[in-house]
Structures are given as structure tokens and as C-alpha cells.
From Swiss-Prot:
One GO MF term attached to the UniProt entry: ATP hydrolysis activity
Keywords: ATP-binding, Chloroplast, Nucleotide-binding, Plastid, Transport
Similarity comment: Belongs to the ABC transporter superfamily. Ycf16 family.
Keyword Plastid: yes
Pfam families, per the entry: ABC_tran
Domain ABC transporter span(s) in chain numbering: 6-250
SMART domains: AAA
Gene name of this polypeptide: ycf16
Superkingdom to which the source organism belongs: Eukaryota
Cellular localisation: Plastid, Chloroplast
Annotated residues for binding of ATP: 38-45
Cellular component annotations (GO), alphabetically ordered: chloroplast
Official protein name in the record: Probable ATP-dependent transporter ycf16
Organism: Porphyra purpurea (Red seaweed)
Length: 251
């Protein structure tokens, strides 16, 4: 098995025939937290969706390896069952589907892939009760429809709850800090830090350095015009906060 959870090699991708990713290279080992920053239109969110297998994006060149195996031919649901989790910038509402049913079905699909027995409703309730406390949610959220009527912070916490429950190997969090006040941000960050282990990896996609005040990444990558143009530690994010993205172009 590969030493890397994720390897992205010379990745080029487009949407509606417009090139967005123009040669992305990235390697992530177990236990690492990577932050990807960049201005609007730099390709950050596109990269996350291409990894997850979003059908709107066309792969032009390159490869994506998950534990050393290409996932390009895997459907999005196969990638999710294999252990790739994507938290959306704007989580969708699913009317008519309760949080509890959605989470139990998703968890059992993941367990089936891992050749583990499905959980009964009682076993699931015992597990979800443990996980729900992690993100400061009330049990009443389980009976509500998925994200329907949720505030922005509640939607983001619901995604972290999914991440906790599914125990994904690679979690990609696309602008999880977007629209959160400082109290909600701290709760989300605490949950993410608790879920970071020596065997999984987390990718944080963000515009702002403030998230990295609470979650310290091993690596910070700056994207510009569809490529990773600079890599460093958390100090790079702090420099970016001081000088802006034009500073990257001049270095």
C-alpha cells in the first residue's frame, strides 16, 4: 500500500469547456492536515469537486490516486464509500428525508464497503448520540429533515457530524468557515481537531487565515490560476493575511 492517502499528479480539469485546473500536484500522508488557500477563481473548490468525482467537471489530464490506486473510473458514491468525504461550502437541503435516516443509510453503506455488519436502529442511535455531542448539536436535529430550515452554522455542524460518523480516511472541507460567527467557528474547529487522527487526513479549503488560528495545518498551499504556486507552513497563511494575494504573485 502507498505511503500516501492522496496523490494528485499533473491534474488538468475543465467545466463547460473552460480550463480550471492547469497542472495540480499534491501528496497527502496519513495524519496530515493540509490547508488550500487562494483568491476566487483560483481552482480551490473545483479541485475538491474533481477529487469527489463531481460529474460536471471533465478531466483533461493527470491522475488522482487514493492509497496508490487511481480513482478516476470510480463513481462519486463509490469514492464516498471508499472513504473520501466532501463537506460542501453550501450544504444542500433534502426535504422529506430525516437526518437520522440519511445518516444511518450513509453509515451502513460505508460499513458494507468496509465489510462490517450494518447497524440496527438501536445500535445506530447509541452511536449517533455519542457523535452528536462532539459538534454541540441537540438530538432533536436528528428528527428534522436534512439541513431544512437550518442556520448556516447548523448546516456546517451537520456536515462535521457526518464526517465524525462516517470515519472517512480523507475529509475535504470546502470553506467550512464561510458565514460562521466566532463562536460557531470555534465549535466547528474543536470538532475537526477531535476527528484528526494519525490514520486519516484533512484538507481545509479556505479564503481566510482565521480558521487556521484554531486548526493548525501541517502544510499550507496557495492556489492561483489553477495551480499550486506556493507551499509552506502556517506562517505562509499569516503572511498572506498581512500582504494579500498580490504578494504571492510578486514573490
Amino acid at each position: 500500500m502507498s505511503d500516501y492517502i492522496l496523490e494528485i499528479k499533473d491534474l488538468h480539469a475543465s467545466v463547460n469547456d473552460v480550463p480550471i485546473l492547469k497542472g495540480v500536484n499534491l501528496s497527502i500522508k496519513p495524519g496530515e492536515i493540509h490547508a488550500i488557500m487562494g483568491p476566487n477563481g483560483s481552482g480551490k473548490s473545483t479541485l475538491s469537486k474533481v477529487i469527489a468525482g463531481h460529474p460536471a467537471y471533465s478531466l483533461l489530464n493527470g491522475d488522482i490516486l487514493f492509497y496508490g490506486r487511481s480513482i478516476l473510473k470510480m463513481e462519486p458514491d463509490e469514492r464516498a464509500r471508499a472513504g473520501i468525504f466532501l463537506a460542501f461550502q453550501y450544504p444542500v437541503e433534502i426535504p422529506g428525508v430525516s437526518n437520522a435516516d440519511f445518516l444511518r443509510i450513509a453509515l451502513n453503506a460505508r460499513r458494507k464497503f468496509r465489510e462490517l455488519p450494518e447497524l440496527s436502529p438501536l445500535e445506530f442511535f447509541q452511536l449517533i448520540t455519542e457523535k452528536i455531542n462532539l459538534v454541540g448539536m441537540k438530538e432533536s436535529f436528528l428528527s428534522r429533515n436534512v439541513n431544512e430550515g437550518f442556520s448556516g452554522g447548523e448546516k456546517k455542524r451537520n456536515e462535521i457530524l457526518q464526517m465524525a460518523l462516517l470515519e472517512s480516511n480523507l475529509s475535504i472541507l470546502d470553506e467550512t468557515d464561510s458565514g460562521l460567527d466566532i463562536d460557531a467557528l470555534k465549535i466547528i474547529a474543536q470538532g475537526i481537531n477531535t476527528l484528526a487522527t494519525s490514520t486519516n487526513s484533512i484538507v481545509l479549503i479556505t479564503h481566510y487565515q482565521r480558521l487556521l488560528d484554531y486548526i493548525i495545518p501541517n502544510f499550507v498551499h496557495i492556489m492561483s490560476d489553477g495551480k499550486i504556486v506556493k507551499t509552506g507552513n502556517v506562517n505562509l497563511a499569516q503572511d498572506l493575511e498581512k500582504h494579500g494575494y498580490d504578494w504571492i504573485k510578486s514573490t
